[in-house]
Amino acid sequence: MGKTLKDIFYRFSDDQVAFRYGVALKLSSMSLIFVGLVMFFLYILLKIDLIFFNANQFPGAKEFQEAYFDFVFSNSIDLLPYILGSLIIIFFAGLYLTYLILRPFKLLSKYCDDVCNGKKGSFNPEMLTDHRLLIMFSDYFFSVSEQMIAENKFKLTAIPERFTKVHKPVYDWSFFMSYFLIILALTVLSIIGVITVDTGIREQIIELSTNFLKATPSVKYFLSEQFVVFDLIVYLLISFHVAIHFSFGFYLYSKVATPAFAIFSTMRSFLKGNKSARVHLIGYSYLRDDCRKINKYLDLLSKLPE
């Protein structure tokens, strides 16, 4: 038991694991906050209902209030499993998202580690559709370095023109759009859940009002108008939710675009003759182990005679 807990502790203390779980928790938290805000505004509107009915002394208002609290409690209990289930789905979707984000770096570092340990490295760029600049140049870099190792000689290498004019991180739209679609799917899941809850509660409130209150035109008008107001609130929250996920998409992209460019520029500089070039990333601890393996591979190449 003690060993198991110790393994779990060390696993969660790993920077990459912490990053993956952190992203997954952020995604889950955004959806949870979104649902919480919708429920909060709905609760306020329903409280206004009670105040309105009691202030106007509608017949059956007292019975309506008692039924209302029973309704809120029972519906909260009924919705809890669905909310928890959705959060679990979003959490694991976040873990999968981070797996996709880190996969190119893992493949690069695995190749470097295999070669350094005397194994035959395998790097298949066709497996990846993201980080095309890094992947395409890495494929070129590894083909050149394999030849150097085979000949046991380090030699300066001409850089293909398409790689010489890149001096800053570039947007890989295929990468960004693929991850944005995943984030959008999570947003749609949250929105569908909120609309379903909103529709169900709305129907219940109308039914309660019909059963316990005199169905006067003023009551019908008040209920219809208050739900119009609530719809506006929901639309605003949905817009905010989508905007947050857009921002989160750019945030995730920045977490890999800068390191990808750093590795690319280091490899390019190395082929130009800067044998001391190494990957040094500050603030990207979740890639520390991968960068260490890449640097170890560069150490191996730098020891080749010229």
Listing of model-derived features with the role each one plays in the protein:
Residues T4-R103, V166-G249:
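Alpha-helical transmembrane segments and their helix-membrane boundary motifs
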